[in-house]
Amino acid sequence: MRYRFMAAAAGTVALIVSTQTAPLAAQGRGGRGTPIQAGEQCPPGTTEIRPRSCMAPEFPAPSIIDYRPRNTLKVPEHKVPKAKFPAIDYHAHVGSFLNDAAGLANLSAQMDSLNLGMMVVADNISGDRLKQAVALVSASPTMKNRVRILTGIRFNGVGSPGWAEAAVKQLEDDVAAGAVGVGEIGKGFGLSTRKADGSLLKIDDPELDPVWAAAARLGMPIFIHTAEPEEFFKPIDFNNERWLELSLFNDRRNGPGTGRPTFDDLMAQRDNLFRKHPKTTFVVAHMGWHTADLARLGTMFDEMPNLTAELGAVLYDIGRQPRAAHDFFVKYQDRILFGKDSFQPEEYPYYWRVLETKDDYFDYYRDYHAFWKLYGINLPDDVLKKVYYKNAQRITKGLPTAGFPR
C-alpha cells in the first residue's frame, strides 16, 4: 500500500491519497515484511514490525477519528467530581450567566457541584456592561463574594492621537466600577490585530506602554493569551501531533504560507513586554503554551518575578508527563493558577483527577486535543491550595478570602 502527499494551498490541510498496490501488502504476509534502511521511516500505510521491516495491515485501516481502542488496563480509579479545596477559576468565560438573577443562580448551582469557590470572569467586560454585571453580582447574597470581573483593552485605533490616554482612562473608570484586572487579552493580539495605520500591532509596541504602566499603578494584573500551541505554527502533516484539530478548525492554522508571525517571533515579543514592565503583574494563559517544554517556562519564571501562569486547556500535556509535571508544580508552586477556559462543567473533574490523584492511564475529555491517556500528578495539599486559590488571591486585589481554607 503506497501513499503520496498531495500539495495543499496555504492554510489548507494536505491530504494523503492512497495508491494501493497489492504487492507491498503481500510482501508483508508470512512474516518477511518490506525492508527499510536504518533511520528511514516506514512508507505511509505501513508500520514497523521488526527493526527495519515494515508491513501493511491486512484489514482496512480505520481513520484516526474512528480508531477508539478499548482500554484493557486494570488499575485503581479515583474519580474526583469535586475539587478537594474550593478552587478559583481564573480563566472563566461565563459572561452569559451575568445577564440576570436566574443566570447567576444557575451558575451558583453548577459551581457548588464542582466546589468552585470563585469565578474570575475573563470576558473583557468594560464600561456600562461592567457596571451592570458588578451590580448584579453585588446584589446577590450567595454570589457577591464568588464572582469577580476582568476588564478589557480596546486595541482599535492604536497609534491614533489620544488612543493611549483614552485607554488609560477606561482602565481607571473600570477599576472604580469594580474590575480586578485586565483580560483575557486574546490570541489575536500580536497575531492579527491591526493598528490605525493598518500595520500589524506587535505585542511589545511602545504605543501600549502607558497602558501597561497604568495597570501597574492601579494594581491590575494583566491576563494575556499569546499565540497558539507551537504545533499550530508547523506544517500540517502526519508528524504533527495536532493534525486532527488543525484539520477540523481552519482558524487555528498559522503555519508556513499563512503570512502569520512565527511562534518564536510572538514569544519573543511577549517576553520583551514582560521585561519592559517589571512592575506590572502578567498572567500568561495556557501556561504560555510551554507545557510541552516546561524547562522553558521555568526559565521565564526564574528571570521574570512579575510572571504567573494559568493552566487552562493544557491538561493534555500536564497529564502525560506526571513525574516532570509534579516536580514542576512543586518547584513553582507560587507561580501557577488554576483556570479552565471554556465553561463545560463535565470537564472540570478531569482537572481534579490529574492534579489530585496518582491514577494511571485514563481518558482525556476531548479527542481532537489529544489521542493519548492521562496520569495523575498527585500534588500535595499545600501545593493544591496555592494553585487552586491562594496564588490568585495573592496577585489580585479584591479577591475575597472568606470561605477558603488558610
Which residues are covered by each model-predicted region?
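C-terminal segment of classical bacterial N-terminal signal peptides
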Residues: 15-23
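N-terminal pre-domain segments of enzymes
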Residues: 27-85
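Active-site gating/metal-coordination segments in enzymes
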Residues: 69, 132-253
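Acidic (Asp/Glu)-rich catalytic clusters
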Residues: 79-82, 107-113, 132-147, 169-179, ...
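Divalent metal-dependent hydrolysis catalytic cores, especially in the metallo-beta-lactamase
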Residues: 87-93, 106-128, 146-154, 180-187
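Histidine-centered divalent metal-coordination motifs
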Residues: 91-95, 225, 286
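Acidic-and-aromatic substrate-binding clefts and catalytic sites of carbohydrate-active enzymes
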Residues: 95-103, 121-132, 156-165, 202, ...
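H/E-rich (His + Asp/Glu) clusters that bind or coordinate divalent metals
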Residues: 254, 258-406
